[in-house]
Amino acid sequence: EHEYLGDYIASSVIGKRALSSVMVVKTEKGSGVHVTTDNISYCTSGMYTNALVTAGLEDAEVKVTGPFKISGTSALVGAMKAYSVMTGKEISEDTMDAATNELVATANLAEAVGDSDKAEQLIAAAKEKVLSQRLTKREDIKKAIESSAKELGIEVPEDEVDKLVTMMQKVSKVDVNVDALKKQAGEIYNKLKDAGIDLSNVDTKGLAQKIGDFFANIFEAIVRFFSGL
């Protein structure tokens, strides 16, 4: 656990022993990822869901429990490894690192803004923009985070924004299908939709494609002009 979490969270929060228990059950195709928790104080169900979907989990019921109130940070690592063994799908070290970073960053964000639901929704909205628009540069990712925060009416401290940008740069390198992302974390994205944030209209074209379309449109206009002579 310390191997994956040590860079992102104090050892006092991680604890000396992994006390959480994780159960992962594969469910029918299209059902999405659903997480329930009991006696977990640091991470919410939505935080786990966001991070697990980033790690590539699909169609699974995940139950995280503690013998008493515990942080539950080790549960993410346990859930990813259990899913990998159960399905035979390998989860790379980089992907596990990105998902772990995401979980901790979301928990820290929730503490900073005082609202776990808003923190979960901000991460989900910004992540969708980063992945669908293939954003990799810090300034572009920062704009995606800030625009998502504005849409949700959240004021995020600058130091937290910087941490989120660093985390999202890692997420941007993970091979995640955007449509699958929204389906697997459907509960969170439905909340965004209810809040009036429609991510279905996000422009997913990269800069190269936009430039190509621009010149294609010019060429088409020239052809139409000469065809009319």
Task: Give the ranges of each region predicted by the language model.
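Charged, long alpha-helical assembly modules
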Residues: I154-L229
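Soluble oligomerization/assembly scaffold segments of membrane-associated complexes
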Residues: V53, E58-I154
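Acidic/histidine-rich, surface-exposed loop or edge segments in extracytoplasmic proteins
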Residues: K26-H34, G56-E61, V104, A124-A126, ...
